[in-house]
Curated annotation (Swiss-Prot):
Activity regulation note: Activated following phosphorylation at Thr-182 by p38-alpha/MAPK14, p38-beta/MAPK11, ERK2/MAPK1, ERK3/MAPK6, and ERK4/MAPK4. Activated by stress-related extracellular stimuli; such as H(2)O(2), arsenite, anisomycin TNF alpha and also PMA and the calcium ionophore A23187; but to a lesser extent. In vitro, activated by SQSTM1. Inhibited by diterpenoid alkaloid noroxoaconitine.
Organ and tissue specificity: Expressed ubiquitously.
Family in the record: Belongs to the protein kinase superfamily. CAMK Ser/Thr protein kinase family.
Gene3D superfamilies the UniProt entry points to: MAP kinase activated protein kinase 2, Phosphorylase Kinase, domain 1, Transferase(Phosphotransferase) domain 1
UniProt subunit comment: Interacts with SQSTM1. Interacts with ERK3/MAPK6 and ERK4/MAPK4 (via FRIEDE motif); the interaction is direct. Interacts with YWHAE; the interaction prevents phosphorylation of HSP27/HSPB1 leading to disrupt F-actin polymerization.
The protein, known as: MAP kinase-activated protein kinase 5
Length: 473
């Protein structure tokens, strides 16, 4: 029996509400396809995480690949999957969706955990790395590339000191057949061959170079590049590649650093970190995929198997906590991912009278709502204007927290520009209006010096308020 048919049999078509209570207002985090919520098993009162996807082939593929990988102790487990109709606000009728019940991860995201751990040691970083590598090895043995390895997708099971870390979110995962051509990435964690694939695609579309008979591809080695970046940040608190310029796309200076593998180990943070740790980073951040460590090479590396104490306290926790920008950087990454995902998610919806789905035709004729329909209030599928409004707010956060090219009027002008755009789309938001008054905003610019980190935090609160659902009907 095929894996596809096994998965189809595993998906329940009964209403999830028969077995679970769903808290529509409590969000655990935002995956690439929308917020993850809390649900409670009625028979046991056990809490689980609930992810909701539009029921499309891409979503079923995500579920299939995640199910294939989820038997590993360092990968978030799928408990069960429901296929139900769910109606969100601004939708005229229910839409078929997959409701994925997953194990609850109470310990939070990787970098949040580190920022709360004042004595995070190199040994602990090594142990976390080993768990991530074991999860990747399991995926790669199944010939699956995750393609979105980043700190937000690495969660701790609970708050105990020895809690396992687990990989989640298989929204970009693909079976690696040497044809992983769709550029999917988060800027700080993107491998050089992904950028090369993107560059060739753009040139071919523009007719600058002839379409090559054999497309430039990238594969599982990209996950290993991302692992190298994550290790680097875990050890020192900042990424090896960054740009001095805020941009909605990867700027030239950052692109050049990635393509040439240009990074350093600044003495201030790296002087107490072992040569073994630096060695594994160097070998993972090789520009040429064939020179990069394999996942087996990572697991065999002395740093992951050392008997040395490695009890030196890392600077990463203090840096992340003091700069208070981890959440803002993650939001900027999410925005970048959304922009790169636009082409993948464009959908043409047929009017109901012309749809060829026999179930929908039957429902139309009956003139009734589906028996298994779930009707809620939520902003995640809001109007185009509301999406643009959130996008403009995230631009403000990015401008506030990304490294600045310089000081003075130029940077102030850039902040004023992005704030004007955000203000244009969010004038009715009382929280933003009140906050901007305290920052001396006159509608066109800030008249006083702005504490950018405080502004980023306020705008983050505005976004959270804008995306909070109403009570369910």
């Amino acid at each position: 029996m095929s894996e596809d048919s096994d998965m189809e049999k595993a998906i329940k078509e009964t209403s999830i509400l028969e077995e679970y209570s769903i808290n529509w207002t409590q969000k655990l985090g935002a995956g690439i396809s929308g917020p993850v919520r809390v649900c409670v098993k009625k028979s046991t009162q056990e809490r689980f995480a609930l992810k909701i996807l539009l029921d499309r082939p891409k979503a079923r593929n995500e579920v299939r690949l995640h199910m294939m990988c989820a038997t590993h102790p360092n990968i978030v487990q799928i408990i069960e999957v429901f296929a139900n109709s769910v109606q969100f606000p601004h939708e005229s009728s229910p839409r078929a969706r997959l409701l994925i019940v997953m194990e609850m991860m109470e310990g939070g995201e990787l970098f949040h955990r580190i920022s709360q751990h004042r004595h995070f040691t190199e040994k602990q970083a090594s142990q976390v790395t080993k768990q991530i590598a074991l999860a990747l090895q399991h995926c790669h043995l199944l010939n699956i590339a995750h393609r979105d390895l980043k700190p937000e997708n690495l969660l701790f099971k609970d708050n105990s000191l020895d809690a396992p870390v687990k990989l989640c979110d298989f929204g970009f995962a693909k079976v690696d057949q040497g044809d992983l051509m769709t550029p999917q990435f988060t800027p700080y964690y993107v491998a050089p061959q992904v950028l090369e694939a993107q560059r060739r695609h753009q040139k071919e579309k523009s007719g600058i170079i002839p379409t090559s008979p054999t497309p430039y591809t990238y594969n599982k080695s990209c996950d290993l590049w991302s692992l190298g970046v994550i290790i680097y940040v875990m050890l020192c608190g900042y990424p090896p590649f960054y740009s001095k310029h805020h941009s909605r796309t990867i700027p030239k200076d950052m692109r050049k650093k990635i393509m040439t593998g240009s990074f350093e180990f600044p003495e201030e943070e790296w002087s107490q970190i072992s040569e073994m740790a630096k060695d594994v980073v160097r070998k993972l951040l090789k520009v040429k995929p064939e020179e990069r460590l394999t996942i087996e090479g990572v697991l065999d590396h002395p740093w992951l198997n050392s008997t040395e104490a490695l009890d030196n306290v890392l600077p990463s926790a203090q840096l992340m906590m003091d700069k208070a920008v981890v959440a803002g950087i993650q939001q900027a990454h999410a925005e970048q991912l959304a922009n790169m995902r636009i082409q993948d998610l464009k959908v043409s919806l047929k009017p109901l009278h012309s749809v060829n789905n026999p179930i929908l035709r039957k429902r139309k004729l009956l003139g009734t709502k589906p028996k298994d329909g779930i009707y809620i209030h939520d902003h995640e599928n809001g109007t185009e204007d509301s999406n643009v409004a959130l996008e403009k707010l995230r631009d403000v956060i990015a401008q506030c927290i990304l490294p600045q090219a310089g000081k003075g009027e130029n940077e102030d002008e850039k902040l004023n520009e992005v704030m004007q755009e955000a203000w244009k789309y969010n004038r009715e938001c009382k929280l933003l209006r009140d906050a901007l008054q305290s920052f001396s905003w006159n509608g066109r610019g800030f008249t006083d010096k702005v504490d950018r980190l405080k502004l980023a935090e306020v705008v983050k609160q505005v976004i959270e308020e804008q995306t909070l659902p109403h009570e369910p009907q």
